[in-house]
Amino acid sequence: MLDAPVRLTDLAHGGGCGCKLAPSVLQQLLANQPQAAPYAQLLVGTETGDDAAVWQIDEERCVIATTDFFMPMVDDPRDFGRIAAANALSDIYAMGGTPIMALAILGMPLGKLPIETVRAILAGGASICAEASIPVAGGHSIDSPEPIYGLAVVGLCAVSDIRRNSGARPGDALILTKGIGVGVYSAAFKKQALSNAAYEEMMASTTLLNRVGHKLAKDDDVHAMTDVTGFGLLGHGVELARGGGVALDIDFARIPFLKEAQELAEAGLITGASGRNWASYGDAVVLPAETPDWRRALLTDPQTSGGLLIACAPERAEAIRGTIEAAGFPRATIIGAVAAGEPAVRIG
């Protein structure tokens, strides 16, 4: 963790995927928007709140497009760029694709930040794109009151490999590939209450590319995928349940958490986005009686560059989990199962 002359987080009112508009607000904004005639080539659009748009270009191939940007959740400019780039790339992997190029999205308060700081943000993002073997082929920049950085990413995918958030089937096992708690860690960081060890753990998690999703999509026993980001495990779980018309049964005791997440949440170091996520999705969630507020906050904790939530055939679940672990995801865990029923997430 580097000391920065200006704390990037002091220049932003929010950070990471906790900056996302509340789902309920987003629904209001998108309601009654003019709709173009249906496009046969648009295989995935806005209908199920999936991770990216997918456009079929011929019988076998499609293009995947996504964009993600946010304000800083850390002060080290290079680390900010790395997290933002990994987060943007994740949507391509979650759909089963592989990225081919990115465009940078940059808004900076140039009167408050030196050029060297902004250059370091861009360098951090470029380093992650280099790790993903893609170029940053251009972009757009503005002078803005708060620092903003992210990417628009284009990827390719075989039509047969597309993995939506709407394919979960009753009986499927649920696998989560990364630990939960990035939002809690970022809240603690903002208040200078995060240990150096926890910071390093957060950086390792948020900069770990989800490219295993591309490999998993070639397995016919993997039925649905989504990445867990700003709406938290519950929010993205509800989207998966609604997309497939199923219920998700998740065992709280099996959920992998970052090492200090539960302690920090119990101490009240949670984000405002956690409450907004509950307000938007809580009506589709069943919690045990007497669930403490801190547990609920962890379940709705906004993740930045979070893990993949995967629904797969139960008889292959352990083998698939092992494949994920071997790809560099030591926290990959089977956390529950898919059941028939009204779309909901049920926590046990």
UniProtKB/Swiss-Prot annotation:
Record-level GO BP terms: selenocysteine biosynthetic process
Disulfide bonds: none
Residues reported in the UniProt entry to bind Mg(2+): D51, D91, D227
Enzyme Commission no: 2.7.9.3
Catalytic activity from the UniProt record: hydrogenselenide + ATP + H2O = selenophosphate + AMP + phosphate + 2 H(+)
UniProt site positions, description: Important for catalytic activity: K20
Cofactor: Mg(2+)
Keywords, ordered alphabetically: ATP-binding, Kinase, Magnesium, Metal-binding, Nucleotide-binding, Selenium, Transferase
Any one Pfam family match given in the protein's UniProt record, by short name: AIRS_C
Active site feature: C17
Span of the signal peptide: none
Methyltransferase recorded as keyword: no
Top EC category: transferase
Binding locations of ATP: K20, T48, G49, D50, D68, D91, G139, H140, S141
One Gene Ontology MF term: selenide, water dikinase activity
Annotated PANTHER family: INACTIVE SELENIDE, WATER DIKINASE-LIKE PROTEIN-RELATED, SELENIDE, WATER DIKINASE
Family: Belongs to the selenophosphate synthase 1 family. Class I subfamily.
Function, in words: Synthesizes selenophosphate from selenide and ATP.
Protein name in the entry: Selenide, water dikinase
Gene: selD
